[in-house]
């Protein structure tokens, strides 16, 4: 359910805005999205795992808040991020 340190580092490298960047909204959203995808796959096989389901809802809420913040601060970065992550259809 969790992501490996190597995968997390790869996401940081892919979505960073500058060198040494680990906390920008883009990086945080990318990491949360990866965790959400993994947890969604887990819940497909373990439908009655309600503790994990609640954790999923918390993560989705965190991602929504970060995306709202990014949209408020910089619409262009927001649009680029959701396109790269494939969040909107």
Curated annotation (Swiss-Prot):
SUPFAM superfamilies in UniProt: S15/NS1 RNA-binding domain
Question: In its keyword annotation, does this UniProt entry include Lyase?
Answer: no
Key words, A-Z: Ribonucleoprotein, Ribosomal protein, RNA-binding, rRNA-binding
Highest taxon in the source lineage: Bacteria
List, in alphabetical order, the GO biological process terms annotated in this UniProt record.
translation
Instruction: Please give the Gene Ontology molecular function terms for this protein.
Output: rRNA binding; structural constituent of ribosome
Q: Which cellular component appears as one GO term in the record?
A: cytosolic small ribosomal subunit
Query: Has the keyword Transport been applied to this entry?
Result: no
**Matches recorded under Pfam families:** Ribosomal_S15
Q: What does this protein do?
A: One of the primary rRNA binding proteins, it binds directly to 16S rRNA where it helps nucleate assembly of the platform of the 30S subunit by binding and bridging several RNA helices of the 16S rRNA.
What's this protein's family per the entry? Answer: Belongs to the universal ribosomal protein uS15 family.
Oligomeric state and partners?
Part of the 30S ribosomal subunit. Forms a bridge to the 50S subunit in the 70S ribosome, contacting the 23S rRNA.
The identity of this protein, by name, is: Small ribosomal subunit protein uS15
Please tell me the species this chain comes from.
Rhodospirillum centenum (strain ATCC 51521 / SW)
Q: List the lineage, top down.
A: Bacteria, Pseudomonadati, Pseudomonadota, Alphaproteobacteria, Rhodospirillales
